């Protein structure tokens, strides 16, 4: 009998990217499965990229929480409940383990699976599942998601992660530009300007054009000041997510602060350097088929020399355009749990 599976993982961009290999694993072990996915409306594109996803069901928690008891929000929640209950699922798998995802799970029909008390980020969430699974907390997010799906559906996963983004990568011609993401919404995420200049100088010396990503006007303004002395700079601001993915897939390499788009670049198989200043890469390292380096840690920005070393390596990898898979490097010590 065909399994009907509902994935609950609503946000954010990088976290949704981490789930894609688990969907590939499910599809491999249950090729006839019907896989639906509940996601925040702003990120609905990402699940739709995976060919094994049957239906994307959107929610609007980010809007609802601002006016939870308004007639509009109540009406939208009722409509969501009506839609999600059209199918009785064999397994409802909460891959987020937060109380906001528990709210979604409680609207569904089906056996509810999630992380156990010791594995969940918000431990109280584990009390609302029919079946709880233990997954080691301090390990990369892609592995955690693959393990959780395997435990819930009763299989063993193997092989490198498949992000199923071939629609962006198959037949693409790599262009002579680097995608750079030097800005962030929080100051504690930023890397020093003089260090950025050293990295950008190296890219320009190798003849690469610069394409600069920014999430909003403020970030674009900061980035514009940073790159004002460089020729051949193009700003990628306000582009649809699908177009950003195409830009990343055709880049020689990407270097950026820890963000969902940096993780997307790695998932697309491009050489990617991630700069971590306010978060730890222990749980969220860059993961992909190309060369990756996750540098720095929470409160410990990576040194200029460490970044330039890996950037030189990425330049060599991208120049060769090798088809060999190379493992990502994570420069961080695992904290005690």
Predicted features along the sequence, with ranges:
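Catalytic machinery of carbohydrate-active enzymes
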Residues: 1-337
